């Protein structure tokens, strides 16, 4: 169930605790079954060249992406150019 602090647009089945705060989650446009936080951050979709059905939240701190074939030090900001991306932390973003 949604917390009282959730926005009116909250979908009750998608309301969970986010890393930042308890917040509403709503289905994102590129994959209706996936819910992402809407209170502490913006919603973005991974570029279609990366994977159109994958959506990721822009966290309270920057998120960058690395391809599975890259080492943890090889980072790149979206849009990614490969089929799969996953969020990681890294100090100096540089494309793989």
UniProtKB/Swiss-Prot annotation:
GO terms for cellular component: cytosol; keratin filament. The keyword Repeat applies. The keyword Repeat applies. Transmembrane segments: none annotated. Restricted to a narrow region of the hair fiber cuticle, lying approximately 20 cell layers above the apex of the dermal papilla of the hair root; not detected in any other tissues. Residues 10-94 are annotated as: 14 X 5 AA approximate repeats. Keywords: Keratin, Repeat. GO terms for molecular function: identical protein binding. Sequence repeats lie at residues 10-14, 15-19, 24-28, 30-34, 35-39, 45-49, 50-54, 55-59, 60-64, 70-74, 75-79, 80-84, 85-89, 90-94. InterPro entries: KAP. In the hair cortex, hair keratin intermediate filaments are embedded in an interfilamentous matrix, consisting of hair keratin-associated proteins (KRTAP), which are essential for the formation of a rigid and resistant hair shaft through their extensive disulfide bond cross-linking with abundant cysteine residues of hair keratins. The matrix proteins include the high-sulfur and high-glycine-tyrosine keratins. Belongs to the KRTAP type 12 family. Interacts with hair keratins. This is Keratin-associated protein 12-3. The lineage of its organism: Eukaryota, Metazoa, Chordata, Craniata, Vertebrata.
């Amino acid at each position: 169930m949604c917390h009282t602090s959730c926005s009116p647009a909250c979908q009750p089945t998608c309301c969970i605790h986010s890393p930042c705060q308890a917040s509403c989650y709503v289905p994102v446009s590129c994959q209706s079954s996936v819910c992402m936080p809407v209170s502490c951050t913006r919603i973005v979709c991974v570029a279609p060249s990366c994977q159109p059905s994958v959506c990721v939240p822009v966290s309270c701190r920057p998120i960058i992406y690395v391809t599975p074939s890259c080492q943890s030090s090889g980072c790149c900001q979206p849009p990614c150019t490969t089929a799969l991306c996953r969020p990681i932390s890294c100090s100096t973003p540089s494309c793989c």
